[in-house]
Amino acid sequence: MKRSTCVLICLLCALPFILFDAFVYLHFTRRLMNPFGKEMQEKSIVLQDFLPFDEGSRIVKVRAAEEYRFASGDVMPVLDGATALYPVYSAFFNAMYPVGTCSFNGADFEEGSFLQKRNTGGAFKAIVNGTADIIFCASPSQEQLEYAAQNGVELVLVPIGFEAFVFLVNDSNPVVSLTVEEVRDIYSGKVKNWLEVGGDNSPISAITRPRGSGSQTAMISFMNGQPIKPANSIYAGRTLGYSFRYYVDGIVASKNIRLLELNGVYPSKENIRNHTYPIVSNFYAIYRKTDSEREDIQKVIAFVLSEQGQQIVEQSSYISIN
């Protein structure tokens, strides 16, 4: 048999499988929209958009009162933190620090910059090893606290604002609300199909986050001791994901994603402020306890908790502590 004939036969045999895969993608897989897939990643925070001292920056621009400002030559703390809080602490930096203290090479902050953005896991390592002086993050995970303890570092956590932990689905999903227990049952593997919680007959693809990330730490706390063991593959059906409200609404802002009500309450700013939404948590300015007497660190903390600092928190779409 000629080689060309063999190739043709192979292609004809493969064609039904190719058509089937295309059908599945168009009518099933594509509509799932992994909340942590490529679309979410492409819409992640772009550092350049929130740089201090930049006329086109999207940060909240407030000039700190004289008592809170640093001058060139002063001892100044290095600020770092979680990705979702970067626009907030970059605005703090812009308000307090002199021009020339932030070094950005077009892709990342340089080693000598007083402003850094290493994400949650990297920021906790930085505060422990001394390469950052104040970090802005959600509550640390048990592993992060143990890492600090193992290295002889005790941390001080100062609440500076409120945020909501939210659950999200593709906008085509008919489910608009889940209860706390339903979410826990889904992520512990007890509930496997959307039909069981008022949706259509489709497997639930429950997405998880990397261990050590702020959202995964929040999810572990939310599960209240139950192990996270989703029943289905992440490619099995309509997805359910979780994150913090600001990241989903303020950064991703995709029409394909919808936040769910929890116990019948939508995570609006008002419902977060009055604590009717079930999962409201603090985020913190965190520093080493041994640095408690450092005037530069206490100056930053005082500004963050001042009326101007809390204005930055509020206008950055978070909820102020005061």
What are these regions, as identified by a protein language model?
Residues K2-E163, L168-N322:
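Exported/periplasmic ABC-transporter solute-binding proteins
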